[in-house]
């Protein structure tokens, strides 16, 4: 009996070590300069095969080897942070109204819908539940969550997951510092820059002066020389590049569907990689992983 207990304990320790090594490896790729490794970020988890932003969708991403999962936050009537993209529950749950008008218990009594709007068995998860599931297994990218920056940080600290979460905002450094300076240096922060819009270069410069972000999320609806020059400018800062391949308006037409439906992966994911991207956010995580593994750009 003692041998069995010792074996089980050893097995648990091995699994814990493997998980810790996984996160360490992803962080090293995110924070360092390793051009031979591309990180895959899955948008709203694996929403094609599970409800978006659900625990099951996140578990699917973990199982397939995704490096980072993107989530969004809202606050309930009684002050809990839950994982939900929309302000209302109309599209993604079997109910109606604003998230902020319901308590957590009321939301938990409802169920999430899948991609074809059918009710499932899955419940809306809290940020705490998500971070406990992801702990030691996968990085987390909080997209729509800047309004809850300090509250989210408290959850990360409580769950021991500060080191595996990225928080983002499309704002100049000075504004972020003023609003969230108390926690800005305690998390991995990523600026979002819309390169095709006025003021993009000023936002880049505001961060270049004050800090070196782990990465910049770059959004652009065209691939004009002006946009390409700004991509180069960010690349030259030494920070990594995060580029979305979700739909054409986010990546100058080099999107997932071009890779999958038009069978042009080199003009999509290949083009993005050639711009120097370290992270690619996708709605096709399994297919992007397959593409990268064939090129030996992912384990």
Where are these predicted regions, by residue range?
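Phosphate-group recognition and catalysis centered on beta-loop-alpha active-site segments
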Residues: 19-299
């Amino acid at each position: 009996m003692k041998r069995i207990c010792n074996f089980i304990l050893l097995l648990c320790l091995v699994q814990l070590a493997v998980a810790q090594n996984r996160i360490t490896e992803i962080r090293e790729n995110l924070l360092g300069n390793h051009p031979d490794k591309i990180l895959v970020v899955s948008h709203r988890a694996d929403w094609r095969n599970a409800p978006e932003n659900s625990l099951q969708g996140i578990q699917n991403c973990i199982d397939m080897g995704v490096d980072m999962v993107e989530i969004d936050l809202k606050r309930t009537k009684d002050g809990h942070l839950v994982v939900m993209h929309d302000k209302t529950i109309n599209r993604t749950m079997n109910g109606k109204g604003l998230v902020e008008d319901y308590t957590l218990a009321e939301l938990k009594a409802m169920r999430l819908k899948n991609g074809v709007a059918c009710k499932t068995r899955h419940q809306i998860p809290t940020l705490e539940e998500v971070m406990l599931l992801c702990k030691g297994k996968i990085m987390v990218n909080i997209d729509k969550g800047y309004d809850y920056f300090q509250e989210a940080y408290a959850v990360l600290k409580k769950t021991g997951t500060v080191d595996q979460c990225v928080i983002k905002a499309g704002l100049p450094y000075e504004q972020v510092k003023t609003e969230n300076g108390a926690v800005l240096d305690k998390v991995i922060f990523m600026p979002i820059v819309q390169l095709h819009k006025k003021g993009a270069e000023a936002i880049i410069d505001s961060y270049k002066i004050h800090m070196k972000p782990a990465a910049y999320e770059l959004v652009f609806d065209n691939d004009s020389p002006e946009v390409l020059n700004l991509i180069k400018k960010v690349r030259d800062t030494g920070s990594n590049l995060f580029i979305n391949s979700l739909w054409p308006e986010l990546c100058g037409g080099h999107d997932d569907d071009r890779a999958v439906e038009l069978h042009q992966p080199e003009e999509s994911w290949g083009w993005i990689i050639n711009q120097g991207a370290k992270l690619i956010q996708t709605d096709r995580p399994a297919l992007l992983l397959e593409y990268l593994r064939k090129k030996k750009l992912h384990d």
